[in-house]
Amino acid sequence: MVMLLLLLSALAGLFGAAEGQEFRLGKCTSPPVQENFDPNKYFGRWYEIEKIPTTFEKGRCIQANYSLKENGKIKVLNQELRADGTVNQIEGEASPVNITEPAKLEVKFFWFMPSAPYWVLATDYENYALVYSCVSIINLFRVDYAWILARNRHLPSETVDFLKNILTSNNIDVKKMTVTDQENCPEFS
């Protein structure tokens, strides 16, 4: 059993290093989310300021747009500018996991893939939002994801530090967070 755990650890470390994501020992943490979350105030465009690197976001000028769908769920439209100048976008759907905690959402982009958590840890709706997600792998490892979002392409460093402190206080490592390039970006439709 110990040999199997060592092998899984080594493989997870290699995969994480290759993809820019980090596998951590243990289950996903459960940080507190935004109290009295109001999705209607959250709707609209958000620009990505910083993130824990992901395999599925490789471009720049990354932004997300949230709106209400006819079925009552939330439309999620993520867009980025690729290095070759083309726009990459993906559309998904989010819905609350539990009506008593509306800041805990699940988002799904492909019908054949499971939903992923999308937890709004903090937002003032007008300037910033902090989003956290975590994927547990066979209850031994976890991969943390975090995004600092803003209504504008730039956010004061004090606000970024405030949001990173929320992550750190919940045992979410921010050392690998990277700044998203939001310079000279086109307006996506």
Swiss-Prot record:
Keywords: Disulfide bond, Glycoprotein, Lipid-binding, Pyrrolidone carboxylic acid, Secreted, Signal, Transport. Pfam families: Lipocalin_2 (PF08212). Residues 1-20 form the signal peptide. GO terms for biological process: brain development; glucose metabolic process; lipid metabolic process; lipid transport; negative regulation of cytokine production involved in inflammatory response; negative regulation of focal adhesion assembly; negative regulation of lipoprotein lipid oxidation; negative regulation of monocyte chemotactic protein-1 production. The keyword Nucleus does not apply. The modification Pyrrolidone carboxylic acid is found at residue 21. One of its GO terms (molecular function) is cholesterol binding. Disulfide bonds join 28-134, 61-185. Glycans are attached at residues 65, 98. It is found in: Secreted. Belongs to the calycin superfamily. Lipocalin family. Homodimer. APOD occurs in the macromolecular complex with lecithin-cholesterol acyltransferase. It is probably involved in the transport and binding of bilin. Appears to be able to transport a variety of ligands in a number of different contexts. This is Apolipoprotein D. It comes from Macaca fascicularis (Crab-eating macaque). The gene is APOD.
